[in-house]
């Protein structure tokens, strides 16, 4: 299969990724100015959701509509995948009917197997390992507010989860230093750490991670599928709550990001999203525009670019 996919930040070169987030800024500006731009007219995106989502569905569906195309939502119950059809068989059929497929799933291997058997681009809308579309939005948001992130320091506070893994990949591709503050036993995937080398540092003190940082980011302490661990995680992660006082330790122009949904009073203080240093709402909106840039890159013929 010759289709180009987006399963990981490592699938593209640093220049390609930078081009995507810059294109996201341009497409956002087109939308603000009310200019019609429909390079994906008559194109159809299939969206397979094994994990539910608000932002992922809205951003991809609205993005396809804004670019002139359409999106079809499929829950796990709506396909034969939910009844035991092999992933490879589903991929071969769906990719004959669609122009691209976005999958939000649990096991990352579901994505890689689907992509290996697909004629059309496959996009990782989230897996247990990675969340690369969110990192496109995060990098676009930093670019809009502060310019290049190259050489900056980013602090990730909390669970070494899929978002943290994607931040590690972003540190490699966008050339910034990443400090990860997490409890022992909740570190990010060692394979990603090995790939990043000296770009990533694991610390146990969240204050040390935040000190002098240009960007601070976090996520929920208990992800989907981990509900039975909630009580234990709440106790272990309590010292890792990000607050306004936390941001006071960072650079004066620090930005705070959260991929949302946020649990106010848990991983963040109740008032943090309302702090002037928080750009979480811009970050959420930029899922739409960064993913439009990705869809255009993967699906639209080059001669249709504005």
Curated annotation (Swiss-Prot):
Instruction: Copy the pathway line from the protein's UniProt record.
Output: Amino-acid biosynthesis; L-arginine biosynthesis; L-arginine from L-ornithine and carbamoyl phosphate: step 1/3
Q: Which Pfam families does the record associate with it?
A: OTCace, OTCace_N
Which EC class is the enzyme in? transferase
Q: How does changing the pH alter activity?
A: Optimum pH is between 8.5 and 9.5.
**Superkingdom per UniProt:** Bacteria
- Per its UniProt record, what InterPro entries does this chain match? Asp/Orn_carbamoyltranf_P-bd, Asp/Orn_carbamoylTrfase, Asp/Orn_carbamoylTrfase_sf, Asp_carbamoyltransf_Asp/Orn-bd, Orn/put_carbamltrans, OTCase_ArgI
The UniProt keyword set, sorted, is: Amino-acid biosynthesis, Arginine biosynthesis, Cytoplasm, Transferase
GO annotation terms (biological process): arginine biosynthetic process via ornithine; citrulline biosynthetic process; L-arginine biosynthetic process
Which protein family is it in? Belongs to the aspartate/ornithine carbamoyltransferase superfamily. OTCase family.
Role: Reversibly catalyzes the transfer of the carbamoyl group from carbamoyl phosphate (CP) to the N(epsilon) atom of ornithine (ORN) to produce L-citrulline, which is a substrate for argininosuccinate synthetase, the enzyme involved in the final step in arginine biosynthesis.
Record's protein name? Ornithine carbamoyltransferase 1, anabolic
Q: Which organism is it from?
A: Pseudomonas savastanoi pv. phaseolicola
